[in-house]
């Protein structure tokens, strides 16, 4: 079994809901047993954290996001990266690159930063926001210049409390779902919750 097989089956809706829940539980366990490292490729990596978070494993998704060792996004940052590399270990021990140091593939995590961590989902003119804050990250904020205008979603921890900020463009209302179950409908403008 590989993580990618489970990610694709869930993300591409190839399973029923009960099967997806069971597959997500197995996927979560696989990631944990792999030291919270991913072993997915180009097709599955963009969906991994989203699938985990959707089925109640956001804590594991955050551990993947913040993994300091290879394979992991922060490994590159720890080595001085200012771009996303083509491979997880894009430089050798002497700092010499052996592949592209500016490559789109693993940058796919940005989709989850916008759509999961900050919760911005804008599809066919409809906007929903459902942020997924986690204490392992003190704060997050995303700004998306959509066809409807600028959308902002952010959150910040203050102790155990989370403060949210939202910016909604003109002529658009948005349904916001907070992790505690609160549902809000926000009109255009800036909002703090």
What are these regions (language model features)?
Residues 4, 43, 56, 104, ...:
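Conserved active-site and cofactor/substrate-binding residues in soluble primary-metabolism enzymes
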Residues 1-43, 63, 67-70, 74, ...:
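Extended glycan-interaction surfaces of carbohydrate-active proteins
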Residues 59-193:
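Non-catalytic C-terminal accessory modules of carbohydrate-active enzymes
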């Amino acid at each position: 079994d590989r993580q990618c097989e489970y990610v694709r089956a869930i993300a591409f809706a190839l399973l029923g809901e009960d099967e997806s829940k069971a597959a997500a539980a197995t996927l979560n366990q696989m990631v944990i047993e792999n030291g919270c490292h991913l072993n997915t490729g180009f097709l599955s990596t963009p969906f991994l954290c989203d699938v985990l978070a959707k089925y109640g494993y956001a804590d594991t998704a955050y551990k993947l996001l913040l993994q300091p060792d290879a394979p992991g996004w922060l490994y590159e940052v720890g080595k001085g990266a200012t771009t996303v590399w083509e491979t997880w270990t894009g430089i050798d021990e002497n700092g010499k690159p052996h592949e592209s140091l500016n490559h789109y593939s693993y940058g796919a995590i940005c989709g989850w930063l916008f759509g999961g961590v900050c919760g911005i989902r804008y599809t066919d003119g409809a906007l929903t926001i459902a942020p997924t804050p986690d204490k392992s990250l003190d704060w997050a904020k995303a700004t998306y210049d959509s066809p409807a205008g600028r959308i902002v979603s952010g959150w910040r921890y203050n102790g155990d409390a989370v403060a949210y900020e939202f910016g909604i463009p003109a002529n658009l209302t948005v349904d916001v779902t907070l992790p505690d179950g609160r549902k809000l409908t926000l009109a255009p403008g800036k909002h703090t919750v």
